[in-house]
Amino acid sequence: MKITRADFLSGLFASAVALPSVALSSETGAEGEAFASDVPNGAFPWTMTPDLTNRPLGFTIVGDNTAFGRPGVFDRAMEQVSWLKPDFVLSVGDIIEGYHEEQAVIDQQWNEVERSIAKLGCPFFCCCGNHDINNEATARAWRDRRGPTYYSFTYKKALFLVLSTEDPFIRIPDKTIAPYYEMVDLLKKDPQKAMKDMNSFIALPEIAAAKDSGNVVNISDRQVGWVAETLKNHPNPAWTFVVLHKPAWKSADKQFARIQGMLAGRNYTVIAGHTHYFTHENIEGHDYINMATCGGIRQRPGPGNIDHVVNVTMTERGPSYVNLRLNGLLDLNGDSGQPLAY
């Protein structure tokens, strides 16, 4: 019987996704080769644990799928990223549209995005964004499916701190839900028209007000204390990666400034999303990466307005980064399969 490439990949992805999520603990706090996390047994904020290999640490960062995710962009991106064969994928949040009170709608959104994530065939580490947690229904869904909103893990001598900028979350005004989902529905029916009308829609007073409230960074004292304890328990990783949804360094957030102070003396990189616009800054010798989109709508023009992923490979001198546009990741037919990508 002839097995096609599609049959093989389908079986591979199905087998990978079926693996159980197991949290391994580190009794010594040392950064060894094996995966370890501080998350107890129960719901995990990742889809599967990385498998140990002898190759250097390599992972892929993906930007916002929402707000106003363009149909098919994120789904195809997960297939494209699978070609890169990363150890795992790291999300900067805004995975679902959210902003809805009905649990059935939120569950449907998670089910849809998890079907796309299953195409990766590798772990997908979640970071919560303001679209993922913004009311009781979305918070419940996150808690049931992904567990804690901030957590850490170590892998191949690197420490990863995944923070929450929605601690506590901010509710959007109820009056914005109906117009928001009118635009979401238009994106599904006529994406070209929706993309053309987006700037005027975002300028509506009720939408602009919701956007302003959504830009607020919330990091609790408890979370800052957890960061301090985690860094104390892991004093000498080869590198520390700090992941959060909103680029808190751009808003001069006092809580994040405390965390920056705790990172002094370490080799570290900070990675965020939210703005839908790519920027890179070198702050006191450290890389601060603000991811653009992986499906989310354009919010302003300019060279940073791209659908992309960033591939990271650890070397003896530190991380090596490559920025890859989705419409430049081509299959053997020379096709990205991304007609709506920027």
Residue locations for each model-derived region?
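N-terminal secretory signal peptides and thylakoid transit peptides that target proteins
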Residues: 1-16
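N-terminal active-site segment of His-dependent metallophosphoesterases
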Residues: 28-107, 222, 342
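Extended active-site neighborhood of metal-dependent phosphoesterases/phosphodiesterases
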Residues: 29-51, 104-234, 239, 255-271, ...
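Active-site glycine-centered loops adjacent to acidic/histidine catalytic or metal-binding residues
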Residues: 64, 93-94, 129-130, 245, ...
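Short, solvent-exposed loop/turn segments at secondary-structure junctions
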Residues: 69, 98-99, 134-135, 249-252
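Short acidic, glycine-rich surface-loop motifs adjacent to enzyme active sites
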Residues: 96, 231-249
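Short, catalytically relevant binding-site loops at active-site mouths
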Residues: 167-169, 247-250, 277
